[in-house]
A protein has these predicted regions:
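Residues at secondary-structure transition points
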Residues: 1, 40, 44-47, 65
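Mobile acidic interaction elements
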Residues: 3-6, 32, 64
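Recognition helix of helix-turn-helix/homeodomain-like DNA-binding domains
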Residues: 25-41
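DNA major-groove recognition helix of helix-turn-helix/homeodomain DNA-binding modules
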Residues: 44-61
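Helix-turn-helix/homeodomain-like alpha-helical modules used for DNA recognition
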Residues: 58-74
Length: 74
């Protein structure tokens, strides 16, 4: 999951950084820093962020031909 996918997925899911952090049980600054390119979360924190976004209905698109992105699960 790229920082852009994190931000787009969070917004598409209708979550603020604070809400995502609360559900993922991590500091909101980790999300802010990751989305802005300032920092990189530990692998376990990144996995938890992705898990919460997937729980919220986000699908991560990772395609060599079309690039990466996010979409709402049907």
């Amino acid at each position: 999951m790229t920082p852009a996918q994190c931000r787009a997925g969070r917004i598409l899911a209708g979550l603020s950084q604070a809400e995502l952090a609360e559900i993922a049980v991590i500091p909101a600054t980790l999300i802010t820093d990751y989305e802005t390119g300032v920092g990189m979360p530990e692998p376990r924190d990144l996995a938890e962020i992705r898990s919460v976004l997937e729980w919220a209905g986000i699908e991560f698109v990772e395609n060599e031909r079309d690039g990466v992105g996010v979409r709402l699960r049907k």
